[in-house]
Amino acid sequence: MKFLANLKCNHTRASFREYAKILDENLSANDDVSVFAPASAFDEKKHMFRLGAQNFYPCESGAFTGEIGKAMLDEFEIKDVLIGHSERREILNESEEFLRSKFDFAAKNGWNVIYCIGENLSTNESGATKEFLSRQLENIDLGYKNLVIAYEPIWAIGTGRSASIEQIDEVLSFLKTKANVPLLYGGSVNAANIADIAGIKSCDGVLVGTASWDANNFLGLIGAASR
């Protein structure tokens, strides 16, 4: 099972060193773990986890103030990238067109893409979730060999309110009919619900936010998944 930690706008360079040290001392070679750290915390060490980027601009380098280009990621041998997270869609107004340009750039470079999709509460309550997710997936090449899709219902992100096991299973099973790629669930994943989520046949892993920010808490979640 895949365990992806999205640290978002958390951890300094110093605190991430401690975070990484705890993971390195406790993870095994059999653990499939990626950590999407803030760019200021990137390092060149070899870890027991894959280091990923929360964001990038689709360029080698250039006049793009505040952005992160391929040359910068290459320095740290980063090949895993998040695209389409709802916080970037909503807060930073990343459009479907721009997300497509990011996806195409990542695919051209052979990166591992974790493409995030998810509906808001009104869409969910109106029963239009599957149609909405289908439209989001029309934006990318579902045949790309290094694609992972992360389903994160917006109404469950950082709210403490996770989708029910039945809801997650229904949506991920539907997505399996759309794309033969690994599927992740994200949205208030924690140590209390991870075992049930891990038991969903169509679920290949989790994208964890708040519960991953503390290294020991994240390790506890990983351990709880196999109990």
From Swiss-Prot:
This is Triosephosphate isomerase. It is found in: Cytoplasm. Involved in the gluconeogenesis. Catalyzes stereospecifically the conversion of dihydroxyacetone phosphate (DHAP) to D-glyceraldehyde-3-phosphate (G3P). It holds the Pfam family TIM. It is an enzyme of class 5 (isomerase). InterPro entries: Aldolase_TIM, TIM_sf, TrioseP_Isoase_bac/euk, Triosephosphate_isomerase, Triosephosphate_isomerase_AS. The active site is at H85 (electrophile), E152 (proton acceptor). Substrate binds at N6, L7, K8, G158, S188. Its main location: cytoplasm. One of its GO terms (molecular function) is triose-phosphate isomerase activity. One of its GO terms (cellular component) is cytosol. Pathway: Carbohydrate biosynthesis; gluconeogenesis; Carbohydrate degradation; glycolysis; D-glyceraldehyde 3-phosphate from glycerone phosphate: step 1/1. Belongs to the triosephosphate isomerase family. Its EC number is 5.3.1.1. SUPFAM superfamilies: Triosephosphate isomerase (TIM) (SSF51351). PANTHER family: TRIOSEPHOSPHATE ISOMERASE (PTHR21139:SF42). Homodimer. It catalyses: D-glyceraldehyde 3-phosphate = dihydroxyacetone phosphate. Keywords: Cytoplasm, Gluconeogenesis, Glycolysis, Isomerase. One of its GO terms (biological process) is gluconeogenesis.
